[in-house]
């Protein structure tokens, strides 16, 4: 071979290596959530609750009815295998239908708790131990779900029965829970130690396997559903999910285990309780204080952290589809104690601001842990077990929870963040205040009061603690607004009125002199011009 030919062949080989490197580096995967996620355009912001257990008169149907009256319009519904196996898989169907009739929609179905016989540790609490037989084939040769893969069989039956009433399937509960906080930072480079994952007791690879089984089975039963992670807390655990496959030894990519964990969920469900601080991993800013703005921001900054990790792995809406985000557990005590932050005013303000910040940060749902407590905890109602009717129960609604009724009144979930109008509005506000403008995305429904196309909200910003007193200033709006306070009281005011701001948000709506019917007439007349 002459020198010229050698040079040509070597150059060709070198270029082939470069091409192969770049081809692998920029490979676009086309499977599962790497390829597509369900359309989320019809998902409006919703407040939900996990209900909890009260007893006596308060079964799930009555609690759901009461929760709807308290301003909730979604729910985190627990459907454990153990419960369905004991009582029959259809046991929750009537309650699921009741939710739909009440307007409790886009419900989260919480998949968890194998039977003892289907747990990896039958002598322990099955709620805290991963399912057995996860690595059995998911499907048989004829395409049906393999009954020897216990989790697959349970998911298939559950999704098939409840798919008309459940929108999002949450996969387990807090698999990343640990008290060995010093080890968490290692999870960005090493697999978590199964021994310290005390709500899972399995490897990260087996949790990815759980996601894969859930995803492949649920999508076959209902291609329109969302599959979510199981209430994650640590961004480092999410990083590990995205870094590894379900290959059981090292989480490597193989022919049998071709995709990493990001392929197997559409929705990032996370948990954040605002008594715990959060650090923004992108900016390094710490969120440790306990004013209501800071408490609300803690909940959404954890979402921002998860989103940052997802973008690192290409889930940015360009390379791969974006995930949606829901917060399936949070809460704040209605009374302060030596071990927990809380109080009537701070909780009231936190609930209102949490809705506004969640819409700002595009969190689709926020779920409170429980509906009721002894009067001091995170519930909305006090000592419901003493009551025997929905009407009587409603009288136990805590003062700090009543702001959600104002949010329900103005249908805040039908609005989205308007960045341009927010920036303009904030320029007109005094120092130490906060403002957000929302614009309507979803249309008015029959029988629904119309409150216009925009919601302007403003309040005194509370970082370290709740700020007392009021700030007086002159409005500078282009319309005469209807002002609604946290109790739902209405007052029509002028666009240049002098108003007072406190730490509790007020809502200014462009609907004080124009009702929906007139609005429709004007649209028709304009179309004829």
For the regions a protein language model found, what residue spans apply to each?
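Surface-exposed intrinsically disordered loops and tails
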Residues: 33, 118-148, 178-204, 240-260, ...
